[in-house]
Amino acid sequence: MFDRFLRGVPIFKDREVLRNDYVPDKLPHREEQIRCFGEIVSPVLKGSCCSNVFIYGKTGTGKTAVVKYVLSKLVQKASELGSSVEVCYVNCRLSGTEYRVLSSFCESIGVTVPFTGLALGEVFDRFRKGLNSRRLLLIVVLDEIDALIKDRGDV
C-alpha cells in the first residue's frame, strides 16, 4: 500500500511550509513591521515590561507571521542573555472559550488546571500566582481575539 509512496518522487520539497503554524526564515516586504514590533517588545530583554500592542489588518497580510517571527527571535536572544522570557501564543478562534484561553496561559507557565470545572476567576488567580512565583516575563499573544467577542455576542 505504501511502497509506491515511499519509492516515488515527493511532490513537496518541504511539507512543513504547508502547516498553519509555519513561520518562514525570512519575511519579505515586512522589514518595517518587524523592526517596529521588535522595538516595542525589546525592553523585556532588560527585564522590563513592554507595551501592550494591538495589531489589526486584513486577513492574510502577515500579522501573525510577523509576531511569531519577532517573538521567536526575542526568545532566542533572551536565552542567549540568560533572561527569563516566555511567550504564550493562543489562537482564540481555536481555543473557543475564555476558560480555554486562560488555561493556555496556565499551561505555558506550568500551572495545571482541569479541562473544565473552575470559575474563570479561579483560573486567573492560579495563573497570576504561578506567574508571580516563577519570576519570569511572559508575553501573551491573543490571535483572532475577535472570535471570543463575537461568540459572546458582545459585537
Residue spans of the language-model regions?
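Mid-core helix/loop region of P-loop NTP-binding domains shared across ATPases and GTPases
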Residues: F2-D14, R19, G47-C50, S84-E86, ...
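Dynamic helix-loop-helix/coil hinge segments at AAA+ ATPase domain boundaries and subdomain interfaces
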Residues: V17-R35
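Intrinsic disorder
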Residues: L27-E31, C92, G153
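Pre-Walker A adenine-sensing motif
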Residues: R35-K46
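Conserved helix-loop functional segments at active or binding sites
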Residues: P43, Q76, V111
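Walker A/P-loop nucleotide-binding motif
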Residues: S48-K73
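Short, well-ordered alpha-helices that flank and scaffold nucleotide-derived cofactor binding pockets
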Residues: S72, Q76, E107
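Flexible phosphate/Mg2+-sensing switch loops adjacent to catalytic phosphate-binding sites
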Residues: K77-V85
